[in-house]
Amino acid sequence: MTVLTSYKLYCGPDFPAPLEKKEKREKGKIRNISFLIVLTKGPIWKVSSMESTSYNGCIENLDCKFRKSFIEEIIAYEGFGKYIEVINF
């Protein structure tokens, strides 16, 4: 079973922030980016891809380790934390 989950993130000058943190970013430095996270269900749910639906170079410039931890935070917030492993991006 595969679950498709879409998240809208805002990318500031230093790191992406969830939608609700938009107001804390400097005006003019926020870029809207939407991502599709594909979760494959198993003993451990796995994030099998993270695709940008609008490219602006911001997320792509972050190192992989940071992106991994950020997605893990989103997943933990959604209540799936202990069942999900982030892979392949």
Curated annotation (Swiss-Prot):
GO cellular component terms attached to this protein's record: cytoplasm; cytosol; nucleus
Identification of the protein by name: Uncharacterized protein C5H10.07
Lineage: Eukaryota, Fungi, Dikarya, Ascomycota, Taphrinomycotina
